Structures are given as C-alpha cells and as structure tokens.
Amino acid sequence: MEWLRISTSTELVRVATDEIVYVRADGNYSDMVLTNGKSRKMTFQLHFFDEVFQQLQNNMFVRVGRSLIVNKRYIYVINLTEQQLILSGGDLKEPIVFYGQSNANSPQNITLSREGLKMLKELLENEKGNDNG
C-alpha cells in the first residue's frame, strides 16, 4: 500500500492512496474525497496533485478534464452517450456519478467533456492488467 504525504507549514496529511476516490478542483484549492465519504479541502491546486500522483508507483490516478482526477480503481462505468462517469466499488457506500456538459445535475458541480471521457475509456481499454477488461 502506498501512502500520500502532503505537508504544509502548519500540518501534515497522510492518507493511503487506496482510500482516495477522487480529487476535484475548487479555485485555488482542491477537495480530496475519500472512500469513507469525507472530503478534505487542501491548499493546493489540482496540478499539484497531478504531479504528485504521477510520482507514485501504483499509477492509479488519471486526470479527467480540467477539474477532476480519479482513482482508476473506482471507475465503474464510462458512458459516452450519456456523458457519464460512475465511480463505485471497494469501500464506497454509494456510487458517485459525474455528468457531462449537457447535464447540469451533477451533485459534484463538475462537468465532463465527451472528449475527456472518450480519452479515459481508450486509456482503460488499452491498459494491460489483471482485470480482464
């Protein structure tokens, strides 16, 4: 299990990467959402997490558009027609649904582009792994 350590001048946050479901942009901050449903506001922009996740050995995080980085472990459905991304599985109690630009009902206030979802789908289809899919 890999751990993510984020240090600021006033605190150190240490979290297992398996417990991170997604990180979303919120202006100059980012919200890290964990499997237990809790969200932690971090004083870093999303590009900081993008760089940190790229340095991890497990390669489990992927950026989906300008506002969102998701843990690939929790990707359940990518639906290009509905422009929908559903995260589920693991320790998540309920699925998390992100909608495309044509649907403003996303509870996470993030809209995903069709192109971003298409790239994510292709990335996962071309990955070599043990998931038979």
What does each model-identified segment do?
Residues 1-133:
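Basic, polyanion-interacting recognition surfaces, primarily
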